[in-house]
Amino acid sequence: MRLTAKQVIWLKVCLHLAGLLPFLWLVWAINHGGLGADPVKDIQHFTGRTALKFLLAALLITPLARYAKQPLLIRTRRLLGLWCFAWATLHLTSYALLELGVNNLALLGKELITRPYLTLGIISWVILLALAFTSTQSMQRKLGKHWQQLHNFVYLVAILAPIHYLWSVKIISPQPLMYAGLAVLLLALRYKKLLSLFNRLRKQAHNKLSL
């Protein structure tokens, strides 16, 4: 049985709750000692993992809608992407304010450049910012064919974000490996599209070099 438009609306409500409840839990944990011995790191990792969860969920929607024959499920993809951006912004903010501190924000640019894992993180965030800003139907109409070209960069985020997570932890544990594995799986489901994109980019680069 296919989802109806009304059911999709309720699904979106549930997804909003899924995006909001972790924030409420985090606020509670901060105020009631629910974090570990290093609360700053715990906050950074929690916000980063939550952003990654929404990224993977957004990437899951297209193959799920195709294989389950639920075309209306695509309507939830933008919502998941926006929650991914929101949590990624919280992740960046927690690093800037809690790790560096308000008095050392001038060091942020240097940190992002000199630490490779942070460089990957900020590249991912900038891409997510662009995708969030252009996610509306009006921007889709305005950008035309370039809209899809821009939003294909989500696949780059799906590569960079798990590497950023793996690189940021001092001891490799099953959790970051699990996220990386899921990202690889979701990208593998799109191997034909990704191969086509790669060949197109290679052809464009070759044509420019030939001029």
From Swiss-Prot:
The lineage of its organism: Bacteria, Pseudomonadati, Pseudomonadota, Gammaproteobacteria, Enterobacterales. Its cofactor is FMN; heme b. This is Protein-methionine-sulfoxide reductase heme-binding subunit MsrQ. One of its GO terms (cellular component) is plasma membrane. It is found in: Cell inner membrane. One of its GO terms (biological process) is protein repair. It comes from Escherichia coli O6:K15:H31 (strain 536 / UPEC). HAMAP family: MsrQ (MF_01207). Heterodimer of a catalytic subunit (MsrP) and a heme-binding subunit (MsrQ). The chain crosses the membrane at residues 8-28, 54-74, 82-102, 116-136, 153-173. Keywords: Cell inner membrane, Cell membrane, Electron transport, Flavoprotein, FMN, Heme, Iron, Membrane, Metal-binding, Transmembrane, Transmembrane helix, Transport. Binds 1 FMN per subunit. Belongs to the MsrQ family. Part of the MsrPQ system that repairs oxidized periplasmic proteins containing methionine sulfoxide residues (Met-O), using respiratory chain electrons. Thus protects these proteins from oxidative-stress damage caused by reactive species of oxygen and chlorine generated by the host defense mechanisms. MsrPQ is essential for the maintenance of envelope integrity under bleach stress, rescuing a wide series of structurally unrelated periplasmic proteins from methionine oxidation, including the primary periplasmic chaperone SurA and the lipoprotein Pal. GO terms for molecular function: electron transfer activity; FMN binding; heme binding; metal ion binding; oxidoreductase activity, acting on diphenols and related substances as donors. It is a multi-pass membrane protein.
